[in-house]
């Protein structure tokens, strides 16, 4: 389990207060689908995913990216109980969707890249370290039912 210090929690919460979940979520999920094309199999019903441009402009990818990032935002309200908070979502991804839990780690790492790209100078080493711990905690919580 990943534990953030009070300082790390403050860093992530402060950055997140500036995050536009639609923009950041859409880009993060889009990048996941482009960079790791095997992840597209979970989204085939979203329509055209044939090119990077098609993926990044796909309204269903954008909407789901926003939904995913909203869940990450919800995680900030439950940093001390991510596993409990996301138990049902973990179960869904494990038992029904059969998502490879490694995909959660990949998405988290892409999210950190997207945040760095959008928040530049504000994305200090301390903020990055805190964000990496946060996304690792989220990935761990979402993969919990697989263990």
From Swiss-Prot:
Binding sites annotated in the UniProt record for heme b: 64, 93
Tissue: Red blood cells.
GO MF term list: haptoglobin binding; heme binding; hemoglobin alpha binding; metal ion binding; organic acid binding; oxygen binding; oxygen carrier activity; peroxidase activity
GO cellular-component term (any): blood microparticle
Keywords carried by this UniProt record: Heme, Iron, Metal-binding, Oxygen transport, Transport
Self-association and partners: Heterotetramer of two delta chains and two alpha chains.
Family: Belongs to the globin family.
PANTHER family found in the cross-reference section: HEMOGLOBIN FAMILY MEMBER, HEMOGLOBIN SUBUNIT BETA
Protein name in the entry: Hemoglobin subunit deltaH
Lineage start: Eukaryota, Metazoa, Chordata, Craniata, Vertebrata
């Amino acid at each position: 389990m990943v534990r953030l210090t009070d300082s790390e929690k403050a860093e992530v919460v402060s950055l997140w207060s500036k995050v536009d979940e639609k923009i950041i979520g859409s880009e993060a999920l889009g990048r996941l689908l482009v960079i790791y094309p095997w992840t597209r199999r979970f989204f085939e019903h979203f329509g055209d995913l044939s090119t990077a441009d098609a993926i990044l402009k796909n309204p269903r990818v954008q909407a789901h990216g926003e939904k995913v990032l909203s869940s990450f935002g919800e995680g900030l309200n439950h940093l001390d109980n991510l596993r409990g908070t996301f138990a049902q979502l973990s179960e869904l991804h494990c038992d029904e969707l059969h998502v490879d839990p490694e995909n959660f780690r990949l998405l988290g790492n892409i999210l950190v890249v997207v945040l760095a790209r959008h928040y530049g100078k504000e994305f200090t080493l301390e903020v990055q370290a805190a964000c990496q711990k946060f996304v690792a905690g989220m990935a761990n919580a979402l993969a919990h039912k697989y263990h």
